[in-house]
Regions:
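Membrane-interface alpha helices of multi-pass inner-membrane proteins
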Residues: 176-179
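Alpha-helical transmembrane segments
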Residues: 33, 84-85
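Membrane-interface loops
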Residues: 43-55, 85-169, 173
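Hydrophobic alpha-helical transmembrane segments
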Residues: 67-80, 149-155
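N-terminal transmembrane-helix/juxtamembrane module of multi-pass inner/ER membrane proteins
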Residues: 2-76
Length: 179
């Protein structure tokens, strides 16, 4: 049975990680993110999509194990958004407002200039090929430019990069993850 002290400590830990002032704005951020992707897809799905591949894209091989990096980015983004939201109320709101404005720009771009690319065929049946197929099944080859993946990675880093209260190793780690 949990004691009052352990429940209180759990609540204090939760409030440090996810302060009350950040909960609704962070929830709105998640809803907005999906709305931008799915809303743009619903509006521009039948529009002509522009293939933005270059000859460089044709020269870069698909290396299936790199799918781990893609899925690992979600962990980085969650940590990055929680970290930035927990810094203080003003920082949280500025950080999330930057996200919301940037996502509005992305939405406009996705509707005005829909983009796509040609994905290579995934061959094989090992775990890496299966993970790539799973990725392709859940992440359509549209809404590519501008890249929300790059956007949120960079936001996570720039949200903390100049803050001397954030340990240098965390700032460096965020920078490496963003790149």
């Amino acid at each position: 049975m949990l004691s009052r002290d352990s429940i209180s400590q759990t609540g204090q830990f939760f409030n440090r990680i996810l302060p009350k002032y950040s909960r609704i704005p962070l929830l709105f951020t998640v809803v907005l993110n999906f709305s931008v992707y799915w809303g743009a897809r619903a509006i521009a799905g039948s529009f002509i999509h522009h293939n933005i591949e270059t000859s460089l894209d044709d020269m870069i091989p698909v290396v299936y194990p790199t799918v781990v990096i893609y899925f690992g980015c979600y962990i980085f983004w969650i940590i990055g958004y929680l970290y930035n939201a927990a810094m203080d109320k003003r920082h949280c709101y500025r950080f999330l407002m930057a996200d919301w404005l940037a996502k509005a720009v992305c939405f406009i771009c996705y509707v005005v200039y829909p983009t796509t690319n040609t994905r290579p065929e995934i061959v094989g049946s090992d775990i890496w090929a299966q993970l790539m197929r799973f990725l392709y099944s859940m992440d359509a080859a549209d809404n590519l430019f501008p890249s929300i993946h790059c956007l949120v990675s960079w936001l996570c880093y720039i949200g903390i990069r100049g803050n001397k209260k954030v340990p240098q190793w965390i700032r460096t780690t965020f920078c490496i993850c963003a790149i």
